[in-house]
Amino acid sequence: MPHDNRLQTNTLAAQAAELPPAWQAALQAPAVARALAGVIAHIEQRLAEGAVVYPATPFRALQGLSPADVRVVILGQDPYHGPGQAQGLAFSVPDDCKRPPSLRNIFSQIAQEFTGAPLPRGNDLTRWTRQGVLLLNTSLTVEDGQPASHARRGWETVTDALISLVARDSTPKAFLLWGAHAQAKQVLLPDHSGHLVLKANHPSPLSARRPPAPFLGCGHFARVNAWLAEQGKTPIDWITEENEGDVRQGEFGL
């Protein structure tokens, strides 16, 4: 039985209002506030018309993680559009959900980079967010069976503001930009900010092996950890399940 991840009527505005003050700062500009109000109004209208919208918690990527806490940014496009899949984190699905092809390629790439590390059994990437990885889709909702159905409805204005807020933080971040859609967001990153920007194709099977910048073989996860170590910061444990105990520093360090 799929997890019920449907957005409920009259909950989206309240979720936005409950965001931590650090994120709220990105939503105060008049153009951003108008875009957010517009997309909320559209979604509420679609829900009233009987549409099924995912996920139940569109702002989950921002929960428990302030802009200053972010160490790595991974951008997705829009949520998975099937029942029980999207959970508000880019590329992530619940553990009991069938692993999507893009996530399968992400895990395969991680296993390639960290020799001897097993593929994760679970699909929920919450463990990454707890280490400072922001998993942000540029469109935060989608209708059942209709990919990109809420694109160009205002979400991009909102998420551009969130990305800009993170990029302006004084602490350098690593930005993993996979595919043309994510790479277009590089213009939001200030020059001379010290950020690490890594680009490759999207991990989808349609593009993961395509030259000139295939995702498979990109080395991004190890490069992020090497960059963090150079700055005296703890590397990201990309594999250990949350119930497996302590982080395996030997595998994910240098």
From Swiss-Prot:
Active site, renumbered: 78
One Pfam family matching this protein: UDG
Broadest EC class assigned to this enzyme: hydrolase
EC number: 3.2.2.27
Gene Ontology CC annotation, any one: cytoplasm
Keyword Nucleus: no
Locations listed in the record: Cytoplasm
Gene Ontology MF terms in the entry: uracil DNA N-glycosylase activity
UniProt KW Transmembrane helix keyword: no
Family to which this protein belongs: Belongs to the uracil-DNA glycosylase (UDG) superfamily. UNG family.
Protein name: Uracil-DNA glycosylase
Organism classification: Bacteria, Pseudomonadati, Pseudomonadota, Betaproteobacteria, Burkholderiales
